[in-house]
Amino acid sequence: MARQGGCLCGQVRYEVLGEPLAVVICHCKNCQKQSGSTFSINFIGQSDQINLQGNVATYVDQNDSGDPVNRKFCASCGSPIFSEILSQGNLIALKVGTLDDTSDMEPQTQVWCVSKQNWLSLDTDMPTLMRNT
């Protein structure tokens, strides 16, 4: 299955092929800051699943474990598109909110729950990890 998506201004478009390895809610502090929200919902996949068109910029970051992460975003409007999780080989975390159709992107687990907002209640039916393992 192929899914399409893109940034807010339309300068970046992509097609992602195949199914996600997982759909994950991440509560880490950096995902909160990048999204400007309480968490980020990510399509976890392989870097060869995404065909990207447009000008993306990269912010080199470190995750909460101290590992490098390349955060890719639209160079025009700043919309986060995906992150390359360098410590995990060719894994990417595609921002689900950038997909044109999110109707089948139900999260399966939550990670970095140790960093969640104190006022946020976790779904007790969904597996949760205090960190990422």
Question: Where are these predicted regions, by residue range?
Answer:
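A short Gly-Trp-Pro
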Residues: 1-133
